[in-house]
Swiss-Prot record:
A ubiquinone binds at residue 201. It comes from Lepilemur edwardsi (Milne-Edwards's sportive lemur). InterPro entries: Cyt_b/b6_C, Cyt_b/b6_C_sf, Cyt_b/b6_N, Cytb/b6-like_sf, Cytochrome_b, Cytochrome_b_C_euk/bac, Cytochrome_b_N_euk/bac, Di-haem_cyt_TM. Binds 2 heme b groups non-covalently. This is Cytochrome b. Its main location: mitochondrion. It is found in: Mitochondrion inner membrane.
Length: 379
């Protein structure tokens, strides 16, 4: 009698994806982040569902309903902070996952990489809309400033902004539609994740050496299920420490004041995971130019496969590229820091230099270095 998990129409899919999946034997802990992102998405959907049961998407009661969740609902504060800090942990895993893809040349798996970029945009859109829902000062002004950027689009900009707002300013209509979209988008993300995995399992995983591992593979279970479980425990530890000891560490104090259209906060800034893109936006004096740079800062990932002429897939044996990769990481950390600073010197200049360096590294310096390394290896 054959095993049911190998024959049953539904169990067969799970078996081929999580149990008998042939996996390279040498993938490091950096390959854990895919499963950790799945865990983060699950946590966000479950906590979000419970929050939605008590939240009201109305400008007069939204702030009060969040306060009610934290004060009166059983373990409401835990669910709320798990959801808020879960987003931070989600983005931390997301950035490491993308970084690993860049370092080890996973962008050569084109379909998987492109679906991943769509996923990144979807998660960023969902997180932005979620930040608006508590209807605090930073929620309101963040929504006003970021949606207003669309007015930079020639001809249709102003109409587009008013269409998104559902009126002439951020109002009840805006909040209601943001809540509806914030609720439905995670399920769209879930579908995209399935497509992402489908494409990945067509080609199989990359590995740190960048060589084909078809001749030497091991089953995913028990080897990598155990390894992923350890990563999951560490992720839950980090999330619990954040939630139970430092729940407001990554939040903004301004969001504890109800939204007031007549009073602008001194420094409008998004959550930490958007600060690098926000710094790039602010470093360009022209509005349309800033918006284009903001979008390109993420969209540039889509042209990475065209810009990498390297003959070796990974950076493991390419010290020059490794050095530039870590400069890129340092540059992004600098941009994140600058995004949270006020718009004054020397922060403006540092932001502009870091923004130029970011695009130069991606488009010019790293591809040129790849060519030099190819020459050095006589390829």
């Amino acid at each position: 009698m054959t095993n049911i998990r190998k024959n049953h129409p539904l169990l067969k899919i799970i078996n081929n994806s999580l149990i008998d999946l042939p996996t390279p034997p040498n993938i490091s802990s950096l390959w854990n982040f895919g499963s950790l992102l799945g865990a983060c998405l699950t946590i966000q959907i479950i906590t979000g569902l419970f929050l939605a049961m008590h939240y009201t998407a109305d400008t007069t009661t939204a702030f009060s309903s969040v306060t009610h969740i934290c004060r009166d609902v059983n373990y409401g504060w835990t669910i709320r902070y798990l959801h808020a800090n879960g987003a931070s942990v989600f983005f931390l895993c997301l950035f490491i996952h993308v970084g690993r893809g860049l370092y080890y040349g996973s962008f050569t798996l084109l379909e998987t990489w492109n679906v991943g970029i769509i996923l990144l945009f979807s998660v960023m859109a969902t997180a932005f809309m979620g930040y608006v829902l508590p209807w605090g000062q930073m929620s309101f002004w963040g929504a006003t400033v970021i949606t207003n950027l669309l007015s930079a689009i020639p001809y249709i900009g102003t109409d587009l902004v008013e269409w998104i707002w559902g009126g002439f300013s951020v109002s009840k209509a805006t909040l209601t539609r943001f809540f509806a979209l914030h609720f439905v988008l995670p399920f769209v993300i879930l579908a995209l994740v399935m497509i992402h995995l489908l494409f990945l399992h067509e080609t199989g995983s990359n590995n740190p050496l960048g060589t084909s591992s078809n001749s030497d593979k091991i089953p995913f279970h028990p080897y990598y299920t155990t390894k992923d479980f350890l990563g999951l425990l560490l992720l839950i530890l980090l999330l619990m420490v954040l939630t139970l000891f430092y729940p407001d560490l990554l939040g903004d104090p301004d969001n504890y004041s109800p939204a007031n259209p007549l009073n602008t906060p001194p420094h409008i800034k998004p959550e930490w995971y958007f600060l690098f893109a926000y710094a790039i936006l602010r470093s360009i004096p022209n509005k349309l130019g800033g918006v284009m740079a903001l979008i390109l800062s993420i969209l540039i990932l889509a042209i990475i496969p065209l810009l990498q002429p390297n003959k070796q897939q990974t950076m493991m044996f390419r010290p020059l590229s490794q050095f530039l990769f870590w400069i890129l990481v340092a540059d992004l950390l600098t941009l994140t820091w600058i995004g949270g600073q006020p718009v004054e010197d020397p922060f403006i200049t540092i932001g502009q230099v870091a923004s130029i360096l970011y695009f130069l590294l991606m488009v010019l310096i790293m591809p040129t270095t790849c060519l030099i390394e190819n020459k050095m290896l006589k390829w």
